[in-house]
Amino acid sequence: PAELEKIKALATEQDVDQSVIKLMNIRGYANVRNMCIYTAYILGAEMAMLIDDDELFEKEDFVDLASQYIGGRLYGKTIDGVAGYYLNKYGNYYDDVDIEPWMTYWDRFGFKGKAFDKIIGQEPRIKLTPFAFGGAMIIHRNLFKTVPFDPNVTRGEDIDYLINAKMFGFHFFLDRELSIKHLPPKK
């Protein structure tokens, strides 16, 4: 909270509209992510790297990997965002869930696993992606200065951001080398 007040003071010094400053808070995932991209913006950074507090860097070159393609071009499109992906405690990208009887009828984790196999598990290394993970997103300045996270979205802010970016003509790619260990707390 003290750091947030400093950011608000800096925004006021830069004549940021008070209606925008009122939006600055750290309640909910979307607002926390907005504070991350806003901080990158006011610091003049070319990219924002969004990482969560329950993740571990296992690759020493993670930052180099994350910044390797951002802002470039591939397949005739700008690389405005790069999505990494989570590895669970077992070192794979599948959701670590206990199978419940209802999953027989609504196999969302099975379908998700198939999508991950297709996007994460296959070449090429960099490809356009239909999904992103909020705790493993790299966002170029051209994108984050135009598209914020929707503060009214309480969950799924990462996919919502991807959709909004696409609506504004920006492109998100997934880098199959950009993995990070995700160790969420026990519920």
Language model regions located:
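Short beta-strand-to-loop element that shapes/binds the nucleotide-sugar donor at the catalytic cleft/hinge
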Residues: K77-P101
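Active-site-proximal specificity loops/subdomain of glycosyltransferases
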Residues: P1-T39, L43
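Short, well-ordered alpha-helical scaffold segment located
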Residues: N142-K145
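Acidic donor-binding loop at a coil-to-helix junction in glycosyltransferase catalytic cores
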Residues: T154-Y161
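Short beta-strand-to-loop acidic/aromatic patch adjacent to the donor-nucleotide binding site
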Residues: A45-L56
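A recurrent flexible, glycine/aromatic-enriched loop bordering the glycosyltransferase active site
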Residues: K118-I138
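Conserved donor-nucleotide/metal-binding helix-loop-beta segment in metal-dependent transferases, i.e.
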Residues: E60-G81
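Active-site donor/metal-binding and catalytic loop motifs
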Residues: F168-H171, D175-K187
